[in-house]
Curated annotation (Swiss-Prot):
Lineage: Eukaryota, Metazoa, Chordata, Craniata, Vertebrata
Tissue distribution of the protein: Expressed in smooth muscle cells of the upper digestive organs and their attached arteries and to craniofacial structures.
Protein species of origin: Gallus gallus (Chicken)
Subunit and interaction comment: Interacts with serum response factor (SRF).
Stated family: Belongs to the BAR homeobox family.
GO BP annotations, alphabetical order: regulation of transcription by RNA polymerase II
Keywords per UniProt: DNA-binding, Homeobox, Nucleus, Transcription, Transcription regulation
PROSITE patterns cross-referenced by the UniProt entry: HOMEOBOX_1, HOMEOBOX_2
Biological function: Transcription factor which is involved with the serum response factor (SRF) in the smooth muscle cell-specific transcription of the beta-tropomyosin gene in the upper digestive organs and their attached arteries.
One GO molecular-function entry: DNA-binding transcription factor activity, RNA polymerase II-specific
GO cellular component: nucleus
Main localization of the protein described in the UniProt heading: nucleus
Name used for this protein in its record: Homeobox protein BarH-like 1b
Subcellular localization(s) per the UniProt record: Nucleus
Originating gene: BARX1B
Length: 247
């Protein structure tokens, strides 16, 4: 009965590819004698004709220095990444150290990927600069008429609803965002003035939210003005005593 390993070897290799070990009688059970070829062997097949997983390839001793020779012969083919610093200290130093260890400090031709990574990693790159410029808002310069209209409306109405804000912005030639920002800043000053003047409680709740039912509408404001005008006493020409004295 033939050994299974020998059956597998016969399937992958012809009979003349390797010598027949059955005709050789071993003198001892030493590993060296088993692994070495018998003296009457005609010679093994070239390494290129054997597969990597064959019995002959596994038992044959191959020097590992050949792999090192391949690495030393073509260092640029093994390490094809740019070795110059890429702007990021951690990544650039690690790549530079690895490249100097493999190539002995010799510079390799830079790849186009380096320019792409530099733009991404450098803090002053074009993309970061454009984002920083977009985040800044130019300060709005109001005219005297616009400031007078805003102050006059703020005295009457500390908080604006969306329709009122739209009407005020259209009447003053401003945008809704400009009116909203001005009102927020003006309310902060107003709160400080109220607290500094002896007020025990802020006129609004935390986070700038007004109290319940504290935002009067335009109709309510007009009614309050009418009530104030009605409460004022009419201007008289003089008292009755003064009139009698004159007569």
């Amino acid at each position: 009965m033939q050994h299974p390993l020998e059956l597998g070897a016969a399937h992958y290799f012809p009979a003349e590819a390797f010598p027949d070990h059955r005709s050789h009688r071993y003198r001892s059970f030493m590993i060296e004698e088993i692994l070495t070829d018998p003296p009457d062997a005609k010679g093994t097949a070239p390494p290129g004709e054997l597969l990597k997983f064959g019995v002959q390839a596994l038992l044959s001793a191959r020097p590992y220095h050949s792999h090192l020779a391949v690495l030393k012969a073509e260092p640029a083919a093994v390490f094809k990444f740019p070795l110059a610093p890429l702007g990021c200290s951690g990544l650039g130093s690690a790549l530079l150290a690895a490249g100097s260890g493999l190539q002995g400090g010799s510079a390799s031709p830079h790849l186009p990927l380096e320019l792409h990574l530099r733009g991404k990693l450098e803090p002053g790159g074009p993309e970061t600069g454009s984002k920083a410029k977009k985040g800044r808002r130019s300060r709005t310069v109001f005219t005297e008429l616009q400031l007078m209209g805003l102050e006059k409306r703020f005295e009457k109405q500390k908080y604006l609803s969306t329709p009122d804000r739209i009407d005020l912005a259209e009447s003053l030639g401003l945008s809704q965002l400009q009116v909203k920002t001005w009102y927020q800043n003006r309310r902060m000053k107003w709160k400080k003035i109220v607290l500094q003047g002896g007020g025990l409680e802020s006129p609004t709740k935390p986070k700038g939210r007004p109290k319940k039912n504290s935002i009067p509408s335009s109709e309510q404001l007009s009614e309050q003005e009418r009530a104030r005008d009605a409460e004022k006493p009419p201007e008289s020409l003089g008292s009755p005593a003064e009139v009698s004295q004159e007569e």
